[in-house]
Amino acid sequence: MSFRGGSRGGRGTGANAGFSGGRGGFGGRGGGRGGFQQRDNGPPADVFAMGSFLHASEGEIVCESINTKIPYFNAPIYLENKTSIGKVDEILGPINQVYFTIKPTEGIQATSFKTGDKFYIGGDKLLPLEKFLPKPKPPPGAPKPKRAGGARGGRGGPMRGGRGGGRGAPRGGRGGFTPRGGSGGFSRGGGGGGFSRGGGGFTPRGGARGGSRGGFSRGGR
């Protein structure tokens, strides 16, 4: 999946110029899901090698990932001695060759590092790569997984009801309980079970944020 915004020009070198990952890659800045925003509580007990310095660009540090996992956006980045030097700003490139940029903290110069210098991250700020890979399709004839949501409703109350039954309940106009064993739960306009506006399950407003999430993405997977 890709995040909001494209990769900044001039960040890449050679064949990786721009680090545009195309389909299934990472590109751009994080906002929305996957971003990490909280107070700085100091360095973690353990840090793990995250990236290797490539070059400085526009005041930021461009790194090649040397970790099999994906960092959170805005995750603190450290030196091996746990000195904080900045935060993850962008994640770029295809999912099998990830790059990321570090926005240095005040007083840290991106040009003060040299090629091959290592940067580290706390283990709790990493996500497994599998989270961003498409799920395999079930074999033909395999039973479909049941949707989470309300159980199938019974017959409900009488069709006509007494006084106060409300017009439109039998016709399924404005929500309410569907009278004849409908799809269960509360629904606007039928559809699958659970709470829904025209579709099955839970449907968040606006769908998944941030587009398709084939790589590091913030929307659907």
Swiss-Prot record:
One of its GO terms (biological process) is snoRNA guided rRNA pseudouridine synthesis. Residues 4-35 are annotated as: RGG-box 1. The keyword Acyltransferase does not apply. GO terms for cellular component: box H/ACA snoRNP complex. Pfam families: Gar1. Residues 1-42, 130-221 are annotated as: Disordered. It is found in: Nucleus, Nucleolus. Keywords: Nucleus, Repeat, Ribonucleoprotein, Ribosome biogenesis, RNA-binding, rRNA processing. The keyword Transmembrane helix does not apply. Its main location: nucleus. Residues 1-35, 150-221 have a biased composition (Gly residues). GO terms for molecular function: box H/ACA snoRNA binding. Residues 152-220 are annotated as: RGG-box 2. Non-catalytic component of the H/ACA small nucleolar ribonucleoprotein (H/ACA snoRNP), which catalyzes pseudouridylation of rRNA and is required for ribosome biogenesis. This involves the isomerization of uridine such that the ribose is subsequently attached to C5, instead of the normal N1. Pseudouridine ('psi') residues may serve to stabilize the conformation of rRNAs. The H/ACA snoRNP complex also mediates pseudouridylation of other types of RNAs. The H/ACA snoRNP complex mediates pseudouridylation at position 93 in U2 snRNA. Component of the small nucleolar ribonucleoprotein particles containing H/ACA-type snoRNAs (H/ACA snoRNPs). Belongs to the GAR1 family. This is H/ACA ribonucleoprotein complex subunit GAR1. It comes from Botryotinia fuckeliana (strain B05.10) (Noble rot fungus).
